[in-house]
Curated annotation (Swiss-Prot):
InterPro entries: MttB-like_sf, MTTB_MeTrfase. It comes from Desulfitobacterium hafniense (strain Y51). Catalyzes the transfer of a methyl group from trimethylamine to the corrinoid cofactor of MttC. This is Trimethylamine methyltransferase MttB. It is an enzyme of class 2 (transferase). It comes from the Bacteria. Its EC number is 2.1.1.250. GO terms for biological process: methanogenesis; methylation. GO terms for molecular function: trimethylamine methyltransferase activity. Gene3D superfamilies: Trimethylamine methyltransferase-like (3.20.20.480).
């Protein structure tokens, strides 16, 4: 008989519990038809000459002078149909494989930060290559992070070779599936070569892609050259590409959230059309980091209720198209791991999980997605566990209704010693960090708050956790690719 399960990893079981409808069928259809109208009559600006030619040969109306591509309805709908509805994102260790699609819910860390709060000194500083390694290793230890996104940008590495340094460090420090920003076709080929070495060859990598790429259309309604290169090369290699639009309502998209979803949808579907025209059936994710423009502070807040609303809406659009989704949720605007940070993570993380988003990214980052903090990462991991538990819902079966047990205990009894209780007690949520004890026990343990406990646990993980290592020969191959790339760009050797 069916039983509740806690700590469900993305892809292990489909989350079918509590949910959020968000839109009526008529409203989803209205967003869809509005999108088709804009794509066909306004179009997208595409910088890449190769992409323009692919669109033209595929049947789109292309103005090579203005670089505007107008995409007819049938091409959009053909692309939606040919893109896979389910993706298996492989980990270096198959136990870490995850499945995206339907309403499976998973979490992943936020990425691309440029600063960090040191867990020992609480110093605020710029990020380094060593930080990329340490945070990746830390995320590998987080049991509720279902994959790993490049967490921060190393400020001590020359920008032209940062991508290969990131890839080397990440492949060495996690056996989960990884998302790596490659920033163009040339770097994509380098990372592909590295991933093939890890996988045991390009054929094996195509069968089990160990990494995915993120590309960001430029709102409103543009796809720049390096993004097109990654879409095209990813499609040819069978590597999943996440079409991650980053519109800002009121600035780079309409002030109304429905209007923002239209431009967002245009950008993502346009990128998917390019992918499918390049290679039919190429793996893609329907992505989003879209939010609002805070008109008072002139910022793009990631902890706003509107971010949760927009990205829950994006999850529903992805389900409407039967495409795997990746959405922003759980990131925070607070500068330190405080009550504001916890409220913001829970608000947007819960909204997007209830909507059935497949991968929700935002964990571990403060300051509008700029600053990584280890305590925040641990606290977010705990909240992700609770959110997964909550959205799993309540199983209603003969076993869980427990009528026979209730009748046996009768009035004024208790259920503590019942076999039924022992059989199901492990389905209750538990947490190492969240305090549920009585005050006297809390005082005896040092009267520490959530953040203090998280920093202590973070330091313990940093000092004691070791990820599954790469074989020495493969690690040496990755190092040689990094050095080869440094030579090609004329960059001096970077210290490891």
């Amino acid at each position: 008989m069916a039983r509740l399960r806690s700590m469900v990893q993305a892809g292990v079981a489909r989350v079918e519990g509590f949910g959020l409808a968000g839109f009526s069928d008529e409203e989803l259809y209205a967003i869809h038809t509005s999108t088709l109208e804009v794509l066909e009559y306004t179009g997208l600006k595409i910088e890449s000459q190769e992409a323009l030619e692919i669109f033209s040969e595929g049947g789109a109306r292309v103005d090579f002078k203005t670089k505007v591509v107008k995409i007819p309805q049938y091409l959009v709908e053909d692309a939606i149909q040919s893109a896979p509805s389910t993706l298996v994102l492989a980990g270096r260790n198959p136990k870490n494989d995850i499945v995206l699609g339907g309403k499976r819910v998973g979490f992943i860390n936020f990425g691309e930060g440029v600063s960090i709060i040191d867990p020992y000194t609480k110093e605020y500083r710029k990020t380094t290559r060593r930080d990329v390694a340490n945070i990746t290793r830390f995320c590998d230890a987080m049991d509720q992070m279902d994959a790993v996104l490049r967490p921060v940008a190393p400020q001590d590495i020359h920008p032209s070779v940062a991508v290969v340094h990131n890839a080397e460090v990440i492949f060495n420090n996690t056996s989960k599936h990884v998302f790596i920003g490659v920033e163009g076709g040339r770097n994509f080929k380098k990372v592909l070569k590295m991933a093939a070495a890890v996988a045991g060859g390009e054929d094996k990598l195509r069968e089990r892609p160990l990494f995915s790429c993120n590309i960001c259309p430029t709102s409103p309604l543009q796809i720049v050259n390096h993004a097109s290169e990654v879409i095209i090369e990813g499609a040819r290699a069978g590597i999943p590409v996440n079409m991650l639009s980053m519109g800002m309502s009121g600035a780079t998209s309409a002030i109304t959230l429905a209007g923002t979803l239209v431009t967002h949808n245009c950008e993502v579907l346009g990128a998917i059309v390019l992918s499918q025209l390049t290679s039919k059936g190429a793996p893609v994710l329907y992505g989003s980091s879209t939010t609002i423009m805070d008109m008072k502070n002139m910022t793009a807040p990631v902890g706003s209720p509107e971010l949760g609303m927009i990205n829950a809406g994006v999850a529903k659009l992805a389900q409407y198209y039967n495409l795997p989704s990746w959405v922003a949720g759980g990131o925070v605007d607070s500068k330190i791991p405080d009550a504001q940070a916890s409220h913001e993570f829970t608000l947007t993380g819960f909204l997007t999980a209830l909507a059935g988003a497949n991968l929700i990214y935002g964990a571990g980052m403060l300051e509008l997605g700029i600053t990584f903090d280890y305590a925040q990462m641990l606290m977010d991991n705990e909240m992700a566990r609770m959110i997964k538990k909550a959205v799993g819902g309540i199983s209603v079966t003969d076993e869980t209704l427990a009528v026979d047990v209730i009748k046996s205990v009768g009035t004024a009894g208790n259920f503590i010693s019942e076999d039924h209780t022992y059989a199901h007690m492990r389905t209750q949520s538990q947490s190492k960090l969240v305090d549920r004890s009585m005050r006297e026990n809390w005082l005896a343990a040092g009267a520490k708050d959530f953040t203090q406990r998280a920093y202590e646990e973070a330091i313990s993980i940093l000092e004691n956790y070791t990820p599954e290592p790469l074989p020495e020969k493969i690690a040496a191959t990755l190092r040689s690719i990094v050095e080869e790339t440094e030579d090609e760009y004329g960059v001096a050797r970077s210290l490891i």
